[in-house]
C-alpha cells in the first residue's frame, strides 16, 4: 500500500508522509491502548485465531496474545496482512462512544466475524 500511495502522490506532485512506517507494531498497539482507545476485534481471518477473539477487547493481554500468534503462525501483530479487523468504540478524539447493544458471531471453523446488529452513541462519563 505504501508503494502505491507514494506512486500516486508522485504523479500528483505531492509528498507522502508515513510516520508509523517501520515502527514496532506491538509498541504502537500498546500506545493506543494506553492513550484510551477502546477497540474490539470484529473479524479474524488467519490460522491461529479462534472464535474467542470475536468481540474481544484489544488490550495489553490481546497484544501479548497477538505476539504469540506472530511467533506460532506468522500473524502480523498489527493486522497489516488482513489477519484481523477491529472496530474503535471510543478514543480521546470521540465526543461520544459507541455502545454495542447486540451482535452476532459467525464462525466457519477457520475464520469469523463479530457482526454488530444494534448500536448507539452514548455520552462519556
What are these regions (language model features)?
Residues 1-125:
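Nucleotide-activated chemistry modules centered on ATP-dependent adenylation/adenylyltransferase
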Amino acid at each position: 500500500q505504501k508503494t502505491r500511495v507514494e506512486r500516486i502522490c508522485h504523479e500528483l506532485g505531492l509528498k507522502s508522509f508515513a510516520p508509523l512506517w517501520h515502527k514496532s507494531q506491538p509498541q504502537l498497539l500498546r500506545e493506543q491502548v494506553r492513550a484510551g482507545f477502546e477497540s474490539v476485534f470484529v473479524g479474524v481471518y488467519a490460522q491461529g485465531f479462534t472464535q474467542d477473539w470475536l468481540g474481544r477487547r484489544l488490550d495489553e493481554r490481546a497484544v501479548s496474545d497477538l505476539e504469540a500468534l506472530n511467533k506460532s503462525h506468522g500473524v502480523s501483530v498489527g493486522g497489516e496482512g488482513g489477519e484481523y479487523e477491529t472496530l474503535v468504540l471510543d478514543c480521546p478524539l470521540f465526543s461520544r462512544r459507541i455502545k454495542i447493544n447486540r451482535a452476532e458471531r459467525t464462525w466457519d471453523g477457520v475464520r469469523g466475524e463479530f457482526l454488530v446488529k444494534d448500536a448507539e452513541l452514548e455520552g462519556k462519563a
